[in-house]
Design a protein with these regions (language model features):
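Conserved GNAT acetyl-CoA-binding A-motif
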Residues: 597-609
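Conserved beta-strand in the GNAT
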Residues: 540, 548-557, 575
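A short helix-loop-beta-strand connector motif used in the catalytic cores of GNAT acetyltransferases and
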Residues: 529-540, 570
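Short amphipathic alpha-helix that is part of the acyltransferase structural core
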Residues: 485-522
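Conserved acetyl-CoA-binding loop-helix of GNAT-fold acetyltransferases
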Residues: 576, 582-595
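Catalytic-core signal marking the mid-to-C-terminal active-site face
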Residues: 381-484
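Conserved beta-strand-loop-alpha-helix junction that forms the acyl-donor binding cleft
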Residues: 606-615, 630-633
Length: 633
């Protein structure tokens, strides 16, 4: 099942190609039943160049509401929508009412970026649109950024390029901009400004998209992007857009250290500008909307700002996802929101009339990386401060963000702002015990996979690490297990955790094959366990009364080209401690790995064994199939 997430449908381009025609059919029905126009943007933002995606926007150029997201998700995953005959009644209606639709100027607006698969996906969506009626109105905007399509859709009488040109004109603050070899390169190359220098502008080479560059690369790798040495300007301000130019981050180097000015810093700079420049003769509410991942040092800094008479600041923590921030921001006279990744915007009510210069530097609908870039440079020069002074606004508290595997993410229920767990309550109680004084932590479930994300933040790095380790272990051992009883003994089966790695676990593996425990590097093994993913899972069985790990098994998921990219589960390295044999733990482990393999969508599960173990695996419902061949090196 393909999910419609905060970024729309996004996955490998081959999957998007399969559902593209369905999307066209679904969008026509939305136009007809909602009596509104819609936009369709084909992009995968910061993802690898082989990925692609589709996201929908409403008639105002804003992100669509949840009911439309759920409709799209349900529609593309229902097999019946492949059958054109299902749409015959709708075709007749359209034949009768097509002129009314045109009279109301309803249509679909399609845009796509520079990814190699984008034009084909667009063609298939159009094919789906025209299946309902070959006269249905639509427009295609090739090679546009995501913010550009939002703009032309909601401001069709105005030129986006002219809007950018006007915003760029007053900029005099120097900056080197990494364009991620994405569609933003094409737009940036249209303009000339002696103070802005561009790198990574090869938008006509799709395979270079986001490769060793982009805002996501800089933040996740904490490294300068490729081509950074083209301009040897030490300590100068630099910025990176992402693949579809809807987000930006800033950074500079000093004494060989990379200092990143992310979305927290961008929001703090904008609010500083408002505190110094904005006046009002009537009550005015500014809202700073952020997520739980926003560093508390930034929130504290913003709360310390003083505003002019009649102006009030409200700080509002919203659920993760830019659409959630946007929905909260529009409630204020001025709403400022930015995620740490640099995706954000400033929303102005029409009654704000003394900030025309600043208003023209922000997108009227969504976050725009290019406009946000210009706005930051404009504010720096207007406030007459440099980027080092900007960086000194606050010192972020140490933090750790990690991902934890769980059996069922749906068991985790959070508050609206995602900072508190309603369920499981014992986990929230444990978090509360761990986090005292200036430390905080929260756990939130993923929207798509069976994992939760654990965030811990506080003033001392060592204490943050300790709290993170304790909560992580608690989740692994209590929230991620399946209990069973044999011979009046209770056992639990769960994913392995890095804190399980010790000499006893090595000795357990030594009962399976020869292991030189003295040569094993404990930290290297823990790092290996920490890096496991959903396609490489190690499970352990723990005796609840002694907390000993007494069995282990591995499940590897292989993605194949045959059987329509089918998956195969491989069971490896089954071992039960010699003191605990006779409890059926080996069979329980084998059965559990088989069930997990099925859950992950595998069409079969296979394993290798010696002839002496064939009888055991036959009792586990496995059948002999072929012969194993090996080549050892």
């Amino acid at each position: 099942m393909i999910k419609y997430g905060t970024s729309g449908f996004r996955t490998h381009h081959t999957t998007i190609l399969k559902i593209a025609e369905k999307i066209g059919l679904a969008m026509v029905q939305l136009v007809y039943y909602k009596k509104e126009s819609f936009g369709i943007m084909i992009t995968a933002s910061h993802n690898h160049h082989e990925d692609n995606g589709v996201k929908i926007m409403d008639q105002y150029g804003n992100m669509v509401t949840e009911d439309i997201e759920h409709y799209m998700e349900k529609y593309v995953n229902d097999e019946f929508s492949n059958d054109h005959m299902q749409f015959q009644p709708l075709v007749k209606i359209f034949n009768e009412d097509i002129e009314i639709i045109k009279k109301k100027q309803l249509k679909l607006y399609l845009g796509y970026d520079s990814r190699e698969s984008s034009p084909t996906i667009c063609e298939l969506i159009v094919k789906g649109i025209l299946k309902t009626n070959d006269k249905f109105p639509y427009m295609v905007y090739p090679l546009v950024t995501t913010p550009e399509l939002h703009y032309v859709f909601s401001n069709s009488s105005h030129s986006y390029s002219q809007y950018l040109k006007n915003a760029l004109e007053p900029i005099q603050y120097p900056c080197i901009v990494d364009c991620a070899n994405g569609i933003g390169s094409k737009k940036m190359l249209e303009f000339k400004n002696p103070h802005i220098r561009l790198i990574n502008t090869s938008w006509t080479s799709p395979q270079k998209l986001n490769h060793q560059c982009s805002s996501d690369y800089v933040c996740s790798h904490h490294s300068l992007p490729y081509q950074s040495d083209l301009f040897d300007l030490k300590n100068s301000l630099r910025a990176s857009l992402d693949g579809d130019a809807d987000r930006v981050v800033f950074y500079y180097t000093e004494n060989e250290k990379l200092n990143i000015l992310n979305g927290d810093y961008i929001a703090a700079l904008i609010l500083t500008y408002l505190s110094k420049k904005l006046t009002s003769d009537k009550p005015l509410m500014i809202g700073y909307v952020y997520t739980g991942y926003t560093n508390n040092a930034c929130v504290e800094y913003v709360k310390s700002l003083s505003f002019s008479e009649n102006i009030t600041l409200d700080t509002n923590c919203a659920a993760t996802g830019v659409k959630n921030l946007h929905y909260e921001a529009v409630k204020y006279d001025i709403g400022v929101y930015f995620e740490q990744n640099g995706h954000g915007n400033v929303i102005f009510r029409d009654n704000i009339d003394n900030l025309d210069n600043l208003k023209s530097l922000f997108h009227p609908n969504i976050g725009d990386g290019i406009l946000d870039l210009f706005s930051v440079l404009y504010i720096l020069q207007t406030l007459d401060i440099d980027h080092k002074q900007w960086h000194s606004f606050f010192q972020p508290y140490p933090s750790i963000l990690s991902k934890q595997k769980v059996q069922d993410k749906n068991l985790f229920e959070t508050s609206r702002d995602e900072l508190t767990l309603f369920e499981p309550r014992d986990l929230q109680d444990y978090i509360d015990e761990q986090c005292i004084q200036s430390y905080r932590a929260f756990v939130r479930p993923s929207g798509t996979e069976n994992v939760v994300r654990l965030y811990v933040e506080g003033k001392e790095q060592t204490k943050v690490q300790e709290i993170h380790k304790n909560i992580s272990t608690f989740i692994s051992k209590n929230m991620n297990k399946e209990s069973f009883e044999v011979k009046k003994q209770t056992f639990s089966i769960r994913h392995i955790h890095e804190n399980d790695i010790d000499d006893d676990y090595y000795n357990l593996l030594g009962q399976l094959t020869e292991i030189n425990v003295e040569s094993m590097e404990m930290q290297k093994t823990k790092d290996f366990i920490h890096g496991l993913n959903e396609n490489h899972c190690i499970y352990v069985i723990e005796c609840d009364s002694t907390n000993e790990i007494i069995a282990s098994g591995t499940l590897l998921i292989e993605q194949k080209l045959i059987r329509n990219y089918g998956k195969v589960g491989h069971i490896e390295d089954i071992v039960v401690d010699k003191h605990w044999r006779g409890y059926g733990l080996g069979k329980y482990m084998i059965d559990h790995l088989g069930k997990e393999s099925k859950k992950k969508g595998c069409y079969k599960c296979i394993l290798d064994c010696s002839d002496s173990n064939v009888g055991f695996y036959e009792k586990c419902s496995y059948v002999r199939k072929g012969a194993q061949m090996s080549l050892y090196f």
